[in-house]
Amino acid sequence: FPYTTLFRSIRPNARFVMFDACYNGSFHLDDCIANAYIFGDGNTVVTQGNTVNTIQDKWPDEYLGLLACGVRIGQWGRHVHFLETHIIGDPTYHFANTVDPALDMNRAIVVSKKDNAMWYKLLNYPNADVQCMALRKLYENHAPGLPELLQKTYEASLFGVVRMECMKLLYQMNSPEL
């Protein structure tokens, strides 16, 4: 992979790099671009890449806005990765919470993951990806009346990603509301 030789002469400053292509995270090879970022002279802390061919009809930036809420890269990855997708570097790395320091989404996702009352409340939060995660957790918790809630949310939301999350979850439920 001659393209990684470029990284021996530069210092990438991105703390997190997300590769959305096949083989960019092939850590098992002697030379891969994700490793070049991590082990080079730059300041990259964590990368995400795919080791082999990856499906093309995926949603690679799903929940990406949660990173602005201080969600750890590994925690985000747990919700979006496919079998061939990997974190290379520090999965505990996170950006500063610039959305709402009073909202600890890491804690919500791990400690309060079964708290449907909290997730219902977060459906009204002004951040689209927080709303998407709330829908996802209600789905995982088998919340009663979810197909109707997803249909209602789809019809009312001003956020495209929230509407997409509703369609995705309705599809996964094989719901006639879709």
Question: For each predicted feature, which ranges?
Answer:
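Short, small-residue-biased leader/transition segments that mark boundaries at the very start
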Residues: 3-6
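Catalytic-core region of carbohydrate-active enzymes that cleave or remodel glycosidic bonds
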Residues: 11-49, 53-57, 62-82
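Active-site proximal loops enriched in glycine and acidic residues that flank catalytic Cys/His/Asp
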Residues: 20-23, 49-52, 80, 91, ...
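Caspase-like cysteine protease fold
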Residues: 60-144, 163
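Buried hydrophobic core positions in alpha-solenoid tandem helical repeats
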Residues: 118-120, 149-152, 178
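Solenoid-like repeat scaffolds
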Residues: 123-125, 152-159
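Hydrophobic core positions within HEAT/HEAT-like alpha-solenoid repeats
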Residues: 134-135, 151, 166-167
